[in-house]
């Protein structure tokens, strides 16, 4: 069952407010969203919460309802931002799950502060530089092309997306999308969607790690996930057929099942979970 209703909260940090959704009870799971996944409680979140975990889903700086945090200029700054978030939540060593851009942040966090990560799950994580397998440039794509690129079977356009002739566009949605695209560019435009030093530092990851890759990832080629799995000591690897980049959206039940099985096999040590309530 995926009927957990999340609570909406705001954390007050030195640089501004962080918006988050939290639901479920049990060992804490910090979920770091993809570039387009701020502010939503997805079916995957509900499934994981219903499986006996407390899911905590914050919005990155400049995304969703979180403040800008203008001093955060790169992914390295986001690492320290999320260490502040962990401290504010009273979390010592939570499970950390990251999707795409959020997976990159999660990997850097596990490299920089391995003692703060109970387990690590990476889904279609960005962050590596593989010249033979470049990351798609979503900034240059029209919205329809983005949807076709993110999914193996793109969902039909919602009724809200189809406007009658003469109907004004949703300016709030346009402004929010522009803000988030600007924030993403601030963090990862140069070098583009990668940290050239990350690959050689992945040996520092000590947490149990699961790397999940959709076989039909047209945004971040599957070779990136395979490289993550090869470089992180002891990492488990799972490749899901007939699925696109946004696997946690396209196949939430399958992804939740893989994550639940992995987290259940790697429970947090007694006294280290930092359960926040």
Question: Where is each model-derived feature located?
Answer:
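Flexible "cap/lid" loop of the alpha/beta hydrolase fold
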Residues: 107-112, 118-149
């Amino acid at each position: 069952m995926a009927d957990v209703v999340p609570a909406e909260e705001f954390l007050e940090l030195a640089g501004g407010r962080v918006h988050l959704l939290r639901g479920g009870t049990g060992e804490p799971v910090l979920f770091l969203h993809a570039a387009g996944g701020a502010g939503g409680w997805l079916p995957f979140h509900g499934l994981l919460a219903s499986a006996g975990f407390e899911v905590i889903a914050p919005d990155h700086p400049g995304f969703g309802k979180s403040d800008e945090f203008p001093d955060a200029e790169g992914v390295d700054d986001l690492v320290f931002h999320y260490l502040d978030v962990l401290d504010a939540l009273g979390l010592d060593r939570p499970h950390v799950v990251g999707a795409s851009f959020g997976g990159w942040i999660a990997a850097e966090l596990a490299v920089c502060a391995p003692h703060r990560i109970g387990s690590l799950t990476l889904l279609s994580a960005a962050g590596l530089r593989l010249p033979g397998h470049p990351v798609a440039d979503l900034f240059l794509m029209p919205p329809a092309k983005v949807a076709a690129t993110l999914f193996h079977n793109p969902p039909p356009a919602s009724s809200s997306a189809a406007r009658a002739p003469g109907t004004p566009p949703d300016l709030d949605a346009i402004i929010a999308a522009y803000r988030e695209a600007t924030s993403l560019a601030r963090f990862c435009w140069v070098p583009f969607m990668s940290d050239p030093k990350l690959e050689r530092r992945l040996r520092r990851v000590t947490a149990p790690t699961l790397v999940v890759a959709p076989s039909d990832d047209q945004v971040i080629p599957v070779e990136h996930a395979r490289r993550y799995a090869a470089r992180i000591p002891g990492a488990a690897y799972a490749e899901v057929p007939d699925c696109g980049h946004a696997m946690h959206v396209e196949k939430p039940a399958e992804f939740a099942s893989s994550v639940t099985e992995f987290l259940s096999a790697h429970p947090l040590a007694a006294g280290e979970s930092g359960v926040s309530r």
